[in-house]
Amino acid sequence: MGATAGWAVTVYDKPASFFKEAPLDLQHRLFMKLGSTHSPFRARSEPEDPDTERSAFTERDSGSGLVTRLHERPALLVSSTSWTEFEQLTLDGQNLPSLVCVITGKGPLREYYSRLIHQKHFQHIQVCIPWLEGRGLPPLLGSVDLDVCLDTSSSGLDLPMKVVDMFRCCLPACAVNFKCLHELVKHEENRLVFEDSEELAAQLQYFADAFLKLS
């Protein structure tokens, strides 16, 4: 907010230009790099050609160098969180198809939530919690299939910058509702809004069904 001659002007955040949909070649290189330290990004099976480079989501042909998406790849979901007490949602993923959840960010409750996540016994969901330095996050956001925004505001007045970044990356997103979110996210118009874990689970199921039809 800025005050000018007694009246207020609302100024909205804009995403940086480096937030954008990532080319498939860049996605593949990112997946291979993350696969060196995070098993959910590694190939589920070995390619017939040992020279073919394969991740959990993509593969590069050894002859042409062409990168393609795998047909039976898992969906890739990202949630970038500050790991605070305002971001407390649990999810029972028993009815979801194959899904890789990447949760990034740094905050006071990171280790606490990490322990809770690893106590879960999901059938089809893999979770990894990388810490991406500097400009490591934009390529990931430009490569995933869905974002889940758990950002809220203790004041109810701060809009989540992370959703703005998702818009720039042309990502579908599900955002947890709070007081002023409607200024940015319009439910079923530009993104989806949820109130609790049950609504989020229903939205994820809807997304998963659509993903399976397209993949």
Curated annotation (Swiss-Prot):
<feature type="compositionally biased region" description="Basic and acidic residues">
    <location>
        <begin position="43"/>
        <end position="62"/>
    </location>
</feature>
<keyword id="KW-0328">Glycosyltransferase</keyword>
<comment type="function">
    <text>Putative glycosyltransferase.</text>
</comment>
<feature type="region of interest" description="Disordered">
    <location>
        <begin position="40"/>
        <end position="66"/>
    </location>
</feature>
<dbReference type="GO" id="GO:0000030">
    <property type="term" value="F:mannosyltransferase activity"/>
</dbReference>
<dbReference type="InterPro" id="IPR001296">
    <property type="entry name" value="Glyco_trans_1"/>
</dbReference>
<dbReference type="GO" id="GO:0006486">
    <property type="term" value="P:protein glycosylation"/>
</dbReference>
<comment type="similarity">
    <text>Belongs to the glycosyltransferase group 1 family.</text>
</comment>
<protein>
    <recommendedName>
        <fullName>Putative glycosyltransferase ALG1L2</fullName>
        <ecNumber>2.4.1.-</ecNumber>
    </recommendedName>
</protein>
<dbReference type="InterPro" id="IPR026051">
    <property type="entry name" value="ALG1-like"/>
</dbReference>
<dbReference type="Pfam" id="PF00534">
    <property type="entry name" value="Glycos_transf_1"/>
</dbReference>
<keyword id="KW-0808">Transferase</keyword>
<dbReference type="GO" id="GO:0005783">
    <property type="term" value="C:endoplasmic reticulum"/>
</dbReference>
